[in-house]
Amino acid sequence: MERLLIVNADDFGLSKGQNYGIIEACRNGIVTSTTALVNGQAIDHAVQLSRDEPSLAIGMHFVLTMGKPLTAMPGLTRDGVLGKWIWQLAEEDALPLEEITQELASQYLRFIELFGRKPTHLDSHHHVHMFPQIFPIVARFAAEEGIALRIDRQPLSNAGDLPANLRSSQGFSSAFYGEEISEALFLQVLDDASHRGDPSLEVMCHPAFIDNTIRQSAYCFPRLTELEVLTSASLKYAIAERGYRLGSYLDV
């Protein structure tokens, strides 16, 4: 049985090094999809590069943890900036859900202004869309707009019912991440999904060239290792050998 494999590179627009890495991993590797941060410092650069790479499917990386929001979010920002304190607010059940709903719509419209089309799908920076309080908002929005949504089904039991017309891959893996990146790790992710019987799988990745912005990230040099693995000719062969077809959320 042929299975669908979506290799999605997060953080398009984070920095020029990130952008170049994603384009390289698409052009000469197995990355088929990316998600863009519309408030990223290099988003205009990402838009420019994407024009020369029409085969790259582009979704939206909803941001609630970094940079400046597009709308006024006094309930989530500090000194006008988003940050990781969102976890504390979630634990205290103090998330400003109306502000988050408005910000989602604004980022979505900004994406369309930048790229001239709808995103192929939605996910989020640091997976915040999987918070039980936020997931229903994002799931409903994706279903209404007719676009797919990244779903990590492990914490989904706390996220409520899915809209009937919501599209997603059957499987999702964030395991291709960390200090031990290798071709063997990527293939283990595929084998695990095959054993579960998932007919479609998204694998998250972060290929990048190192620049000053990436150097400031807690996840730095493994991004370059990811790029090396994702552009390996032997990996593409091994994927096909396992019965996977490379595609995007447009195929879901």
From Swiss-Prot:
GO molecular function terms listed in the Swiss-Prot or TrEMBL record = chitin disaccharide deacetylase activity; deacetylase activity; metal ion binding
**Subcellular location(s) of the protein:** Cytoplasm
Listed GO CC annotations = cytoplasm
Task: Name the cofactor(s).
Answer: Mg(2+)
Query: Where along this sequence does the record place binding of Mg(2+)?
Result: H61, H125
- What Gene Ontology terms for biological process does this UniProt record contain? chitin catabolic process; diacetylchitobiose catabolic process; polysaccharide catabolic process
Pathway(s) per entry: Glycan degradation; chitin degradation
The UniProt entry, under SUPFAM superfamilies, shows: Glycoside hydrolase/deacetylase
What's the EC number here?
Answer: 3.5.1.105
State the reactions this protein catalyses: N,N'-diacetylchitobiose + H2O = N-acetyl-beta-D-glucosaminyl-(1->4)-D-glucosamine + acetate; diacetylchitobiose-6'-phosphate + H2O = N'-monoacetylchitobiose-6'-phosphate + acetate
Family in the record: Belongs to the YdjC deacetylase family. ChbG subfamily.
> Which NCBIfam families does the UniProt record give?
PRK02134.1 (NF002559)
State the function annotated in the UniProt record: Involved in the degradation of chitin. ChbG is essential for growth on the acetylated chitooligosaccharides chitobiose and chitotriose but is dispensable for growth on cellobiose and chitosan dimer, the deacetylated form of chitobiose. Deacetylation of chitobiose-6-P and chitotriose-6-P is necessary for both the activation of the chb promoter by the regulatory protein ChbR and the hydrolysis of phosphorylated beta-glucosides by the phospho-beta-glucosidase ChbF.
Q: How does it assemble?
A: Homodimer.
Q: What is this protein called?
A: Chitooligosaccharide deacetylase
Say which species the protein is native to: Shigella flexneri
User: Quick one: which gene encodes this?
Assistant: chbG
